[in-house]
Design a protein with these regions (language model features):
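Hydrophobic packing positions characteristic
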Residues: 86-203
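Surface-exposed acidic/polar loop and edge beta-strand patches at domain peripheries
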Residues: 76-78, 82, 96-99
């Protein structure tokens, strides 16, 4: 038996909800396209379903906590409308290696437009949520050097809503009602630290 190949399939059962569900419904059918040897396939078919399910739940919990660590406002106790979006994110988006990368991926998921597969779920949220997600994604990317800063001075981005004011208001439960208001946000990199300072500027 090829340990690397078997471990690869076990890892996929751990992290891939689509594959895990296919294996749960029909293990031989899910394994057939993978080109496993008969002993490998037979061994993987004998894995206890409850073990696979438990490992999947642990992975989903771990990914969820990684996002929450970076994005405090992604709090389903305060905003239960995010629950189905989290489930869809875990199902559709492969896991990332680092916490910040997981949070950036979640921001991109929330930024997706009307043609995204999960667009109907996004439509249940306030219109400003994609703007919040973009603001937070840029904060993380700029802090960790994953997006370019100007050669000197801050980076300034335009938004359709007062996103920093909104983020502060999200300490309270629910979604605050906020009208569109063109706003600029200044991102200033903190030297030698994975951080940026942000402030809202009057729109020109």
């Amino acid at each position: 038996m090829s340990y690397p190949r078997t471990l690869e399939v076990l890892a996929r059962l751990h992290v891939d909800p689509h594959f895990r569900e296919a294996w749960r419904r029909d293990a031989p059918g899910a394994l057939t396209p993978l080109g496993l040897t008969p002993p490998e396939a037979e061994a993987l078919q004998r894995v206890a379903p409850d073990v696979v399910e438990r490992a999947g739940r642990m992975m989903d919990f771990h990914r969820t906590e990684r996002v929450r660590e970076q994005l405090a406002w992604v709090d389903e106790a305060k905003r239960p409308e995010l629950v189905p979006l989290r489930a869809r994110f875990l199902q559709d988006v492969p896991p990332e290696v680092l916490n910040r990368e997981e949070a950036i991926a979640y921001c991109r998921f929330l930024e997706a437009g009307e043609h995204a597969p999960h667009a109907k779920l996004l439509q249940r949220l306030p219109a400003y949520v994609p703007q919040l997600a973009r603001c937070e994604r840029l904060r993380l990317q700029l802090a960790w050097g994953l997006a370019p800063m100007p050669a000197s001075g801050p980076r300034v981005e335009s938004f359709d809503y007062p996103v920093l004011t909104l983020l502060a208001a999200l300490d309270a439960p629910g979604w605050p009602p906020v009208a569109p208001k063109p706003t600029c946000v200044e991102y200033l990199k903190v030297p030698n630290l994975p951080a940026v300072m942000t402030r809202e500027l009057p729109s020109p």
